[in-house]
Design a protein with these regions (language model features):
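C-terminal motif of bacterial Sec signal peptides marking the signal peptidase cleavage site
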Residues: 16-19
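A short, solvent-exposed beta-strand micro-motif common in secreted/extracellular proteins
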Residues: 123-134
Length: 175
């Protein structure tokens, strides 16, 4: 009798432990399915730039190409406090504490450019700078997009016009 009771306790313990493992497996699988269905993790930053015919005008109104840099940042404090000249000449030094990655491209008048890069895990913001010939005192040459506003499916679409960089008015931040 005692052996049977002891055997039943051992069997019950094994079943209980197996059930815990099965429950954990089901719970993990359910969580993974939820994440895959309702939350798309952004692993790639896609940026599409479109330039109007009249960008970066000189003194007589002739358009010129513009250098655009895209920064992956942990925070925006150093980016927003940095001057145009600081970002132009020593961006890596000025942004060192927040900088995750940096890419640059040239955009021509009435042209377009696209960029695709791996999104670094600690990136919380995307900072974009267009280095115009004659940057005005306003921050129209600089733009910040929070990571939460990006789409896993659509690129971040930006427009260059005159001496400004902006998100199109006819669509959301994600393009």
């Amino acid at each position: 009798m005692r052996v049977i009771a002891l055997s039943m306790v051992v069997v019950a313990s094994c079943l209980l432990l197996s059930a815990c493992g099965a429950w954990q497996t089901v719970s993990t699988a359910t969580s993974s399915a939820y994440q895959a269905t309702f939350y798309k993790k952004i692993t790639v930053l896609n940026v599409d730039l479109k330039a109007r015919a009249m960008i970066n005008p000189d003194e007589v109104g002739r358009p010129y190409s513009v250098v655009v840099r895209v920064y992956q940042l942990r925070d925006t404090k150093t980016f927003t406090s940095a001057s145009y000249d600081d970002l132009l000449t020593k961006d890596k030094t000025v942004l060192a504490q927040d900088l995750q990655d940096i890419r640059g491209m040239v955009v021509y008048p009435n042209g377009a450019a696209s960029m695709s890069q791996a999104l670094k895990p600690n990136t919380q913001y995307i900072g974009i700078v267009a280095f115009y010939r004659d940057a005005k005192s306003s921050d129209s040459w600089r733009l910040i997009v929070p990571k939460k506003d990006l789409s896993a499916d659509d690129p971040l679409v930006l427009e260059l016009e005159g001496d400004s960089i902006m998100q199109p008015k006819d669509g959301p931040a994600r393009g």
